[in-house]
Regions:
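N-terminal, polar/charged subdomain of small-to-medium soluble alpha/beta proteins
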Residues: 1-113
């Protein structure tokens, strides 16, 4: 899986990049190698907003796009939450595809006989 980490209003240090790659390993194991993950980390500059550390993840799969966004006071916590949310979405998507595939009748069976 290809992982791209971007920063908006905050620098992306090698430590943050490693943390993102480590947290999204669970997602990488569930999807194909052709999948593309874009993680955008930003710091909102609004004094009225206490949850200024935002992590957004966009996962492009074959035929679909999954997106998750989390905002907290700590960037590390935001990364953890968005990784967990995206892992849940990938599992749900995979289970739905499997259920649809299994619900189809086999080719050798004719309905009504």
């Amino acid at each position: 899986m290809q992982i791209e980490v971007k920063g908006r209003n905050c620098p992306v240090t090698p430590e943050i990049r490693q943390r993102v790659e480590r947290r999204f390993e669970k997602v990488a194991k569930q999807v194909s190698d052709l999948a593309r993950l874009e993680v955008e980390l930003c710091e909102e500059r609004n004094p009225a907003n206490p949850d200024a550390q935002v992590a957004e993840a966009t996962l492009e799969l074959k035929g679909t796009t999954l997106r998750a966004r989390e905002a907290t006071r700590d960037m590390e916590h935001s990364i953890n939450l968005v990784a967990d949310e995206l892992a849940r979405q990938v599992k749900r998507h995979r289970d739905k595809r499997r259920a649809r595939r299994d619900a189809r009748a086999p080719l050798g069976v004719q309905p009504g006989l």
